[in-house]
Amino acid sequence: VLLNNWEATHCDFDEDRLKQLFDGARQVGAELFLLDDGWFGNGPYSRDDDKHGLGDWDPSTKKLPKGLSYIAKEALKRKVGFGIWLEPEMVNPQSELYQKHPDWIITQSKREPILGRHQEILDLTRPEVQAFEWDIIDKTLRPNPDITYVKWDCNRYITQPGSSYLQPADQSHLWIDYNWALYRLMDRFAKGFPNVMAMLCAGGSGRVDYGAMPYFHSFWPSDNTDPLGRIKIQWGFSHFFPANTISAHVTRMGKRHLKMAIDVALSGAFGIDLALDKATAEERAQIADAVKLYKERIRPLVMHGELYRLVSPYESPLASLSYVSTDKQKAVVYFYQTKDGNEPRVMLGGLDAHKKYRVEEVSLAKGVTSRFPANGKVFTGAELMEKGLENPLNTQFESAVLILVANN
């Protein structure tokens, strides 16, 4: 369970601010703190916004005067792991790297380069760029063994495909040669740092593919973290990739109850992208309860269970899915109201017809009583699969999480 600082700070932070955030991460039970964009760049190219410094991967002496090793150890003092953001394939024109090597970017000759998020893409067909990008990774991680997580980002796509390195007759090779070089870099990263967990990130699932999957532990499915959007995104995503690769984070995006944002995120690799110091005490308590619930009861089912699609969000105002443990002893069931309306009963799947299961609604705020008639009761697997669970939800943004445990 990770906490990302981006929503809290963007590029504006220092060591004291990060320590405050570490304290917040510890208080809600997060296991890892991810230091996002903004930790690098110096002088006129300090990474104080997204227009400067990309490509200059020396830690900011202004923000982190004691270096990465110090700030990682400060997280560990609080029993919180430490991860870091990298975007090794990119460069800002406002950077020392670009001033030295303007020919390293992908562009077409005699055309003004087009920027995306104020940045260009480095040409990985060039051997010197391949060496440079490995050096970024190596010099960030090898001297700092306390960094145990990497978010590898990619914030723009290729336009004006052209290489000043490739011969004119080979320009059409750029797409393939780039990707092979990228896979080699990813392979070297995974083998060089086998104890570092990594998420591959790009908006809109732009970096989700089976070729990269051997080198990463999870993917970022979309920058759309509105729960209503994520329900359909994760429904589709999980047709092709397992749930343990779906990074699902609680954010402020969308009109929704915090409970719904939490319940949707609980169906994937759970994380938090919130400014906890700006949250109310009630919201922080809600997050802490969700983290505890996920770590203790839900995570094993999501990470290793079998997925059953119960009600499609494309066919009903309700979306429902479940994960069932391989031994059929436990299951977690999710209910999400994407619109007003009622799906009267939900038939479960994957249970042992002969086992008896106790139903318990979890992810409830303190003092709130379950509305599910089945809550606290025991049913056979056959009953739950043939007759189903009565569903009391009928209003948009309502959600519920139920856990089933077989009575031995």
Region spans (language model):
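Active/binding-pocket-proximal capping segment
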Residues: 38-40, 101, 155-158, 167, ...
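Catalytic cores of secreted or luminal carbohydrate-active enzymes
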Residues: 262-311
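Aromatic-lined carbohydrate-binding/catalytic grooves of carbohydrate-active enzymes
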Residues: 2-135, 144, 148-149
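Glycan-recognition surfaces
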Residues: 92, 98-131, 135, 176-278
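Carbohydrate-binding surface patches
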Residues: 313-354
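Conserved, mostly hydrophobic/aromatic
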Residues: 3, 33, 75, 198, ...
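Short acidic/histidine-rich active-site segments
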Residues: 148-159, 200-208
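C-terminal beta-sandwich/jelly-roll accessory domains of carbohydrate-active enzymes
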Residues: 339-408
